[in-house]
């Protein structure tokens, strides 16, 4: 038994290092060199093919515009303040209850202040009334960064924060700022006037993508009360001259147009679901994405 065990251990040691043949794990130094060289060349070629394929693919992709733009979903509609569970609940006589909503609006509108839009090399005035789309050339850097249209806070009226730093919350008349999410190259197509006959209160303009808010359910519609809309030129929507958006590389300071709605007569102590929708020929809605082209928010003004 002892001899067999010693013989077995000796055979393993000899396999690991054979001093007679100068072999390590059954191979000589030259053999190990050849096999290592083979694998270095083999995997080097694989890496080269992979890198080359990636480089060729990158040559077909623009860093300024997606290749398959037609597969991008329509933009979503978003409200500010953005609160947990999209609920706004507060007491007008309790500043702490609405402080977070006010802070959210203030922070968002910081970049819309006049001081932030002073640089004439970046910003330009695009008019005080809605107008047609403002094309700024191809999506490349041949012309460098593109200019950005200024957006004045004063166009948001009672919801601008210029005259009321609480945006109506201290009076129980909360403001909600509405924006259309950025989609590179998106060109809004406003609906035809006749398609808005269902909403006679909407102020129509062929150069505005309109937005309308109403109660989500029948019982909500009775409790929403009156609403005041604010936007460029007095139109509740997004003027076309702010589109298309050219992306972060070409328009790093881009300001999307805003509008605001103020709920001036909400039924007190009642949770009201309100839905706001953008209307346009290329605005879509999805049951899977409740923010695509619309949003709904619950608002409760407590006594």
From Swiss-Prot:
Annotated disulfide bonds: 126-149, 159-175, 213-276
Pfam family, any one: Na_K-ATPase
Sorted UniProt keywords: Cell adhesion, Cell membrane, Disulfide bond, Glutathionylation, Glycoprotein, Immunity, Innate immunity, Ion transport, Membrane, Phosphoprotein, Potassium, Potassium transport, Signal-anchor, Sodium, Sodium transport, Sodium/potassium transport, Transmembrane, Transmembrane helix, Transport
Classification via Gene3D superfamilies: Na, k-atpase alpha subunit
Domain of life: Eukaryota
Family annotation (PROSITE patterns): ATPASE_NA_K_BETA_1, ATPASE_NA_K_BETA_2
Residues with the Phosphotyrosine modification: 101
UniProt-annotated location(s): Cell membrane; Apical cell membrane; Cell membrane, Sarcolemma
GO annotation, cellular component aspect: apical plasma membrane; basolateral plasma membrane; intercalated disc; lateral plasma membrane; organelle membrane; sodium:potassium-exchanging ATPase complex; sperm flagellum; T-tubule
Modified sites of kind Phosphoserine: 11
Glycan attachment residues as annotated in the record: 158, 193, 265
UniProt topological domain (Extracellular) ranges: 63-303
Positions of the UniProt region annotated as immunoglobulin-like: 191-303
An annotated Gene Ontology molecular function: protein kinase binding
Entry similarity comment: Belongs to the X(+)/potassium ATPases subunit beta family.
Name of the protein this chain belongs to: Sodium/potassium-transporting ATPase subunit beta-1
Protein source organism: Sus scrofa
Gene that encodes it: ATP1B1
């Amino acid at each position: 038994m002892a001899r067999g065990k010693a013989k077995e251990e000796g055979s393993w040691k000899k396999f690991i290092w054979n001093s007679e043949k100068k072999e390590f794990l059954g191979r000589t130094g030259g053999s190990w060199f050849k096999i290592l060289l083979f694998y270095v060349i083999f995997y080097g070629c694989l890496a080269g093919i992979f890198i080359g394929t990636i480089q060729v693919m990158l040559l077909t992709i623009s860093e300024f515009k997606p290749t398959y733009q037609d597969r991008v979903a329509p933009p979503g509609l978003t409200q500010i303040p953005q609160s947990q569970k999209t609920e706004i609940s507060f007491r007008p006589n309790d500043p702490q209850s609405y402080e977070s909503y006010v802070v959210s609006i203030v922070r968002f509108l910081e970049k819309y202040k006049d001081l932030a839009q002073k640089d004439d090399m970046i910003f330009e005035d695009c008019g005080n009334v809605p107008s047609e789309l403002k094309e700024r050339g191809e999506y490349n850097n041949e012309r460098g960064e593109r200019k950005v249209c200024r957006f004045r806070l004063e166009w948001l009226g009672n919801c601008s924060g210029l005259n009321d730093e609480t945006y109506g919350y201290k009076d129980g008349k909360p403001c909600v700022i509405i924006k259309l999410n950025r989609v590179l190259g998106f060109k809004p197509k406003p609906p035809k006037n006749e398609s808005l006959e269902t909403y006679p209160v909407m102020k129509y303009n062929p150069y505005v993508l309109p937005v309308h808010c109403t109660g989500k359910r029948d019982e909500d519609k009775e409790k929403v009360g009156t609403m005041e809309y604010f936007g460029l030129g007095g139109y509740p929507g997004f003027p076309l001259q702010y589109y298309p958006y050219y992306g972060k590389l070409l328009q790093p300071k881009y300001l999307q147009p805003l509008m605001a709605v103020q709920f001036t007569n909400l039924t007190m102590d009642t949770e009201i679901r309100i839905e706001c929708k953008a209307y346009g020929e290329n605005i879509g809605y999805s049951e899977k994405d409740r923010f695509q082209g619309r949003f709904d928010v619950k608002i409760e003004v407590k006594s």
